Every structure is written in C-alpha cells, then in structure tokens.
Amino acid sequence: MTVEDLTFDVEQHIDMKATPEKAFAAVLHRLGKGNTRPDGQSLELELEPKPGGRWYRDRGNGIGHLWGFVQAIKAPNLLELCGPMFMSYPAINHVEVKIEPVSGGCRLALRHRAIGMIDPEHRKNVGTGWNHMLSNVKKDCEQR
C-alpha cells in the first residue's frame, strides 16, 4: 500500500454573483438541511454552525451517523470541518471552505483532504459530490 492509496486531496472552486455573506449562508444550508445527493434525495444532514458544532446525519428514530465537527468558523470567509464524514471505516477528513470577494461577486474554494483506508469508490466519486454541492450553492445565491 502506498501513501496515495491512503490519501486524497480534492480542490474545487466556483465563482458566483453574490456577496460573501450570502454565499456563506448558502454553504451552511447546503452542508446541513439543504444537502442532497445528485439525484435530489436529501442526506438528512444537520450542521451546528459554531466551534465544536456537530455535523451529522439524522435519519430519525435514533438512527444517525456523525460526519464531523466544526473545527473553525469565521463568517463569512472560512469554515473548516473535520471527522469521518461518510466513511464508515478508519479515516479522518478535513474540509476547508474559503470565500473571498472577487470582481462581480465572490469565489468559493473548497478543499477536502482525507487519510485512512480510503474506499476506491469514495476516491472516485467525492469530486462529483462536491461539484454538486457547489453548483447548488451558486444556484441558491443567484436565483434569490
């Protein structure tokens, strides 16, 4: 097994016609109650937007899955999350979302790094999931 087998590092960004404040609110929504799979099905996520706040999936009837914790939050420019996320095996993840003003709006940059016994399917599809989330943030900001 190599280091590459045990890690991944995904970076994506998207520009949008929105203030950083509006984009940050949309990020919180899309990482929480507004998070969906690409087929539109809700992931039933909750995000407590405060240092140490939980990020978890609540399926009801006491069924759930801890995705992580808020490591840092500096609205409207930075959100960092860390934890197992969707990986039910030995792994740790760090997700960093940065928002900065640019001409005509703002840029949202996302970086997801992981280390552990990474499932090849997760490695293959994680970028698609983040692209879906970023597209929804942009749509939320530009349609309102």
Question: PLM features: what roles do these ranges have?
Answer:
Residues 23-27, 55, 70, 81, ...:
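Hydrophobic pocket/interface hotspot
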Residues 12-14, 67-72, 93-101:
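Hydrophobic/aromatic beta-strand elements that line small-molecule binding cavities or substrate pockets
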Residues 85-132:
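Beta-strand/loop substructures that line and gate deep hydrophobic ligand-binding cavities in soluble
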Residues 1-42:
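Hydrophobic ligand-binding cavity/cleft-lining segments
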Residues 44, 139-144:
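Short, highly charged C-terminal tails/helix-capping segments
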